[in-house]
């Protein structure tokens, strides 16, 4: 009934099961509710809410920042999965959220594309908000650049969080992440998203580069360590150095210095491709 607020005693309330009360049960507030023209807002744009129940068009939710509990219509919120996958918002609302005062460079979200049904868009905060279309292959793999394919969206986010690789910047934190309170318990080191990787390896001896021979085992892995211990960006930097310092017979010759490794989510392939192509949404 117009702008009237939802009754606090709904006739039918569907509590969410324990299996639903997970990471996906968050809502991002897209606009102040209720409107300031009617009464002081209970929930403000940019707040993240935990879902209590779903009533078909209305949500009963509690704010993660203020602790206030109330009802809010579905048109005023977007559903959030994994902290960065937003469902139910368009390009304009995505830009509004990414341009909130506390949002930093590199903040991002993935959302359903408005212009291409069945595809997704990656929206990133930089000097301005940039949008990149995410394509889906027939085998359900994803890519932004055709030379880099990923088995799932999580792998795509992980890769571009390590290296920009053609994007406007590296992905840093999901949009509105600052509105989620810090956990009270100590997270596991292997699951903490902000834990830096520390390598306990011998210092690399650059003099060994000149002794590398084409086709030798050392040329394949001059560090003689597991490649998985090094980030993609570090390995690419080493490859670039080798291409600049190696002689004509080196496996890393000069003509390869502008090329990069293909990353495929769960696998890394040693095939070389030309510079990436990106399609802005």
UniProtKB/Swiss-Prot annotation:
Phosphotyrosine: residues bearing it: 278
Record Pfam families: SH2 (PF00017), SH3_1 (PF00018)
SH2 domain: residues covered: 84-175
Lipid attachment points (N-myristoyl glycine): 2
SMART domains the record matches: SH2, SH3
The keyword Phosphoprotein appears for this protein: yes
Tissue: Predominantly expressed in lymphoid tissues. Highly expressed in spleen, thymus and lymph nodes. Weakly expressed in lung and brain. Expressed in T-cells and at low level in B-cells.
Compartmental location: Cytoplasm; Endosome
PROSITE patterns documented for this protein: SH2, SH3
Sequence segments annotated as region (Disordered): 1-20
InterPro entries linked: Grb2-like, SH2, SH2_dom_sf, SH3-like_dom_sf, SH3_domain, SLAP_SH2, SLAP_SH3
Biased segments, Low complexity type: 7-20
UniProt domain comment: The C-terminal domain is essential for the homodimerization and the interaction with CBL. While the interaction with CBL is apparently mediated via the hydrophobic region of this domain, the highly charged region is apparently required for the homodimerization.
Name of the protein: Src-like-adapter
């Amino acid at each position: 009934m117009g702008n009237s607020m939802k009754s606090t005693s709904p006739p039918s309330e569907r509590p969410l099961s324990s299996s639903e009360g997970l990471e996906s049960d968050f809502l991002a507030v897209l606009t102040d509710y209720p409107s300031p023209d009617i009464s002081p807002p209970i929930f403000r744009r940019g707040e993240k809410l935990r879902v209590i129940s779903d009533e078909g068009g209305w949500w009963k939710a509690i704010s993660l920042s203020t602790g206030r509990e109330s009802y809010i219509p579905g048109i005023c919120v977007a559903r959030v999965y994994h902290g960065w996958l937003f469902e139910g918002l368009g390009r304009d609302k995505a830009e509004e959220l990414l341009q909130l005062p506390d949002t930093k460079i590199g903040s991002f979200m993935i959302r359903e594309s408005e212009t291409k049904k069945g595809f997704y868009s990656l929206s990133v905060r930089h000097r301005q908000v940039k949008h990149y279309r995410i394509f889906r292959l027939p085998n359900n793999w994803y890519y932004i650049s055709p030379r880099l394919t990923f088995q799932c969206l999580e792998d795509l986010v992980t890769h571009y969080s390590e290296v920009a690789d053609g994007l406007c910047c590296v992905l840093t934190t999901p949009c509105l992440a600052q509105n989620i309170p810090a956990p009270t318990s100590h997270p596991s080191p292997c699951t903490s998203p902000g834990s830096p990787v520390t390598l306990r390896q011998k210092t690399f001896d650059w003099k060994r580069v000149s002794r590398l021979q084409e086709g030798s085992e050392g040329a394949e892995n001059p560090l003689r360590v597991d490649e998985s211990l090094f980030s993609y960006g570090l390995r690419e930097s080493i490859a670039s150095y080798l291409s600049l310092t190696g002689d004509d017979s080196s496996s890393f010759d000069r003509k390869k210095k502008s090329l990069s490794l293909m990353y495929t989510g769960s696998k890394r392939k040693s095939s070389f491709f030309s510079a990436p192509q990106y399609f802005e949404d």
